[in-house]
Amino acid sequence: MAKKKKKQKRQVTKAIVHIHTTFNNTIVNVTDTQGNTIAWASGGTVGFKGTRKSTPYAAQLAAQKAMKEAKEHGVQEVEIWVKGPGAGRESAVRAVFASGVKVTAIRDVTPIPHNGCRPPARRRV
């Protein structure tokens, strides 16, 4: 059987950190400026299950894991794009700041409908 070639790590200096927060989970995706994924993590990949994935602490750990992996690819400067209404927004952004990379911008790219689809009915408990 032929030897497998080891995949070479791409060296990227500028990146975009996409933080997607929902009511159930937080996904942190680090991409280059073209949108190709360099590293990613979520509440589930850092070891949480169920409702604990939606906590700010899970979002913090996910951001730390993704940034650690991104730094191995040579990322030094990032732009943060935050999307969604979840609980992990603030803590994920703080974790990116604490990782030691230079943050150039923070953008909120949460999609807002201009009277699009009908939203789900409110819960009656």
Swiss-Prot record:
GO terms for biological process: translation. One of its GO terms (cellular component) is cytosolic small ribosomal subunit. It comes from the Bacteria. Keywords: Ribonucleoprotein, Ribosomal protein, RNA-binding, rRNA-binding. InterPro entries: Ribosomal_uS11, Ribosomal_uS11_bac-type, Ribosomal_uS11_CS, Ribosomal_uS11_sf. One of its GO terms (molecular function) is structural constituent of ribosome. Gene3D superfamilies: Ribosomal protein S11. Part of the 30S ribosomal subunit. Interacts with proteins S7 and S18. Binds to IF-3. Located on the platform of the 30S subunit, it bridges several disparate RNA helices of the 16S rRNA. Forms part of the Shine-Dalgarno cleft in the 70S ribosome. Belongs to the universal ribosomal protein uS11 family. NCBIfam families: PRK05309.1, uS11_bact. This is Small ribosomal subunit protein uS11. It comes from Aquifex aeolicus (strain VF5). The gene is rpsK.
